[in-house]
Curated annotation (Swiss-Prot):
This is Satratoxin biosynthesis SC3 cluster transcription factor SAT20. InterPro entries: Fungal_sec-metab_reg_TF (IPR052973), Zn2-C6_fun-type_DNA-bd_sf (IPR036864). Trichothecenes are sesquiterpenoid toxins that act by inhibiting protein biosynthesis. The keyword Metal-binding applies.
Length: 712
């Protein structure tokens, strides 16, 4: 049996037993069936104090409980107890009021001078140690430390006693003669009679994080409660998430107690009346949803919260506008944007389908290669209109295949006249290696493609904004605007067919040069399809990254400082949608009057992609109005030193662009309103049909022109 404090050998150091160092128990394990039954009953009474059960194997025959010298980091008493975060809780006990004179013994052991006002009424009132360390007798080797005692009367017969210690920072400033190695500190002598006087009411060891501070070498551990049913049931409560550095034993009652060497102290049996002053403040278990609540949650997960509810972290509802937005429609003071739901995964700015294949999301085909067929490496270029541009070259390994359902003829219509070109069945044989080459090829073509886009634009608003976006990207290094421009260039690349640099590589003679292929030799349709699908896959990845960054900017608290970057990005993405919209329309018109085998597939895929683009346009426009807090930036004053200039912090070149665009919009206001009011299947066929909505109030009567541009 180990030495107990208060015995003749109480001043001797407690020797650790390797066999019981990790687990110390006081009695044999009770009957499992009875324990489970009692535990279920206890869970019904006190569900907030329980967690999964843990078996307690018997080790010791004598009932005992372990106290710790808890001078370690990450072990603090809640500030609500003492008014500070610098004390450590060693234990809490219920004592009969008739034996409160034991506090004098504790005070002398801990170097305290008891105060007559130490007994608070209804709250803990700690002893205040003197500023100077008290002098101890040589009989007590316990270090002189600024320790405290706290009491709380619970009724007329009993009171609660809390044992408090200093924080680790105070220990680090004490003389070395006080601190010393922890293993050499003697146990605190409480006396034999102290444990016997503990109230036999209930007992529960509870390990719950209080003010837990991060520690680089000691992550927080999970809370565990270990319960059992035996009597008598004294109550002891210890709050700890720290490593126990030493321990000694005090006999209390025949109850199993678990002490972990490297974790919190845990114990058994729930109290019939849980304590309130030092009870756990852990997170309560969330109530289970009923069937109606689960259906509502699942529905909202599919729909998503509106922009305002996401920004203010409110519970949204399926309505549009939702109840929260309708509730503040008249009284709102800070957010004036529309109620929209942004499904980022449903925003599409690129032409990802293939009408010939009948695929909404085109994938690479597989072919049956000819046995022993020759592999050729061909050079491909993109047909730039500017003869001064030196186009990059893409080298692809191709092989002949056996056509099954694949058509090797290229059919198109020019001015109502149908043309048909028979091309040999060749396709890329190593698509994995070719995909990497295509990605590098797109990067090399970025600058000339931007120039090609500029040469195709005739509208001043589009030209001004494209030049400003390129300048902003080059001077600020904005990855968001850069990615949007890359998507724009990729859409331009897929708007035309690539061509071979050689005229007779596939046996195609020079006479096959046609205006439809920009006077270039066409490639086999399967090879052209493969290259365009690889470009689309690269652009879809970039689109995902751009939308993710745009979401972060839109929901940030500094939207008034990033609105210009968001505006340029949304403008370029809308211009990209307009481009692919027009390209798809041109492709459909080119197939009219042609004996095309895929007329049904083409119609279905085209209609599906058009609906996606139209929904994406509405989403991006609504997002811009949310970023701008419902305001219209190009109807405001942008004079030097004005409120807009001060809040947005735009540079001089950006201000020049804003003022120039404002003048252009005011001059063409009637034209822009007519474009916005277009309806029908091809309502975004004209340039600026989608972009004009960034400059005009919505058609539902939104009066956003009178508010300042940046959100407050």
């Amino acid at each position: 049996m180990p030495n107990l404090p208060g015995s003749s050998d109480s001043t001797q150091r407690h020797q650790r037993n390797p066999g019981t160092d990790e687990l110390v128990c006081s009695s044999t394990k009770p009957n499992a069936a009875q324990e489970n039954a009692d535990t279920e009953l206890a869970q019904e009474k006190h569900p907030q104090l329980l967690s999964p059960q843990t078996d307690i194997p018997p080790v010791c025959s004598q009932p005992n409980v372990s106290f710790a010298q808890c001078w370690d980091q990450n072990f603090f008493l809640d500030a609500a107890l003492t008014g500070q975060n610098s004390m450590t809780l060693l234990g809490v006990f219920d004592l009969p009021n008739s034996h409160m004179n034991l506090t004098e013994t504790l005070s002398s052991q801990l170097g305290l001078e008891p105060s007559q006002n130490a007994f608070g009424q209804g709250s803990f009132d700690p002893f205040v140690p003197s500023s100077e360390p008290s002098v101890h007798s040589t009989d007590n080797p316990w270090p002189s430390l600024p320790t405290q005692l706290a009491f709380q009367p619970t009724n007329n017969n009993t009171s609660s006693l809390a044992l408090l210690g200093p924080d680790p920072e105070q220990l680090s400033t004490l003389p070395s003669s006080w601190t010393g190695p922890l293993d050499e500190w003697p146990p605190l002598d409480l006396g034999q009679d102290f444990a016997a006087l503990l109230s036999p009411t209930y007992q529960a060891f509870e390990a719950t994080p209080r003010h837990t501070h991060a520690h680089a070498h000691q992550p927080p551990r999970a809370t565990r409660h270990i319960t059992s049913q035996q009597s008598p049931e004294p109550y002891v409560q210890v709050h700890s998430t720290a490593k126990i550095v030493d321990r000694f034993l005090v006999p209390i009652a025949p109850k199993p107690i678990l002490v972990e060497r490297d974790g919190p102290v845990s114990g058994a049996s729930l109290p019939s009346n849980p304590p309130t002053a030092l009870s756990s403040t852990g997170t309560r278990k969330r109530k289970r949803f009923n069937k109606a609540d689960r259906e509502r949650v699942n529905q909202m997960r599919k729909l998503g919260s509106c922009f305002r509810c996401r920004m203010y972290k409110e519970n949204c509802d399926p309505g549009l506008p939702c109840k929260n937005c309708m509730r503040v429609q008249v009284t709102r003071r800070t957010f004036f944007g529309p109620c929209i739901r942004i499904k980022w995964e449903e925003v599409h700015t690129f032409r990802a389908g293939d009408g010939d294949l009948g695929q909404i999301r085109a994938t690479l085909q597989t072919f049956q290669w000819t046995l022993g067929g020759q592999v050729k490496s061909i050079d491909v270029q993109w047909p730039f209109r500017d003869d001064k541009v030196k186009p990059p070259i893409l080298s692809i390994e191709c092989q002949q295949f056996l056509p099954k359902h694949e058509h090797v003829a290229e059919e198109y219509s020019v001015a109502g006249q149908a043309y048909k070109i028979l091309l040999p069945p060749w396709a890329c044989s190593n698509t994995k290696a070719a995909s990497k080459k295509v990605e590098a090829f797109v990067r090399q073509c970025q600058a000339p493609l931007e120039e090609e886009i500029r040469h195709t634009l005739n509208d001043p608003i589009l030209l001004l904004t494209l030049d400003e976006a390129r300048r902003y990207r080059n001077e600020t290094g904005s990855k968001l605007v850069a990615t949007a421009l890359e998507i724009y260039a990729g859409a331009m690349m897929n708007s035309r067919y690539p061509a071979s640099t050689e005229s007779d590589i596939f046996g195609v003679v020079d006479q096959l040069h046609t205006p439809y292929f920009f006077d270039k030799v066409p490639l086999p349709p399967q090879l052209t399809c493969q290259i365009q699908i690889m470009v689309a896959q690269v652009m879809l990845d970039k689109q995902k990254n751009a939308l993710k960054r745009l979401q972060e900017r839109a929901l940030s608290k500094n939207r008034h400082k990033v609105w210009y970057e968001c505006y340029l990005t949304i403008f370029i993405l809308l211009a990209t949608i307009e481009l692919v919209y027009q390209v798809q329309l041109r492709f459909v018109k080119a197939k009219q009057g042609v004996s095309d085998r895929n007329a049904t597939n083409l119609s279905y895929v085209t209609q599906y992609m058009i609906e996606e683009w139209e929904e994406s346009i509405l989403t991006l426009v609504g997002l811009f109005h949310c970023v701008m807090n419902g305001g219209l930036p190009f109807t405001q004053s942008w004079e030097d030193g004005g409120e807009n200039h001060r809040l947005t912090e735009l540079d001089d070149k950006a201000l020049v662009y804003v003022r120039s665009l404002k003048a252009e919009i005011e001059q063409r206001r009637g034209e822009l309103i007519a474009l916005r009011n277009r309806r029908g299947r091809w309502r975004y066929e004209q340039p600026l049909a989608a972009i004009c909505q960034l400059f005009l109030p919505s058609q539902d009567g939104d009066k956003g022109e009178g508010r300042a541009a940046p959100p407050s």
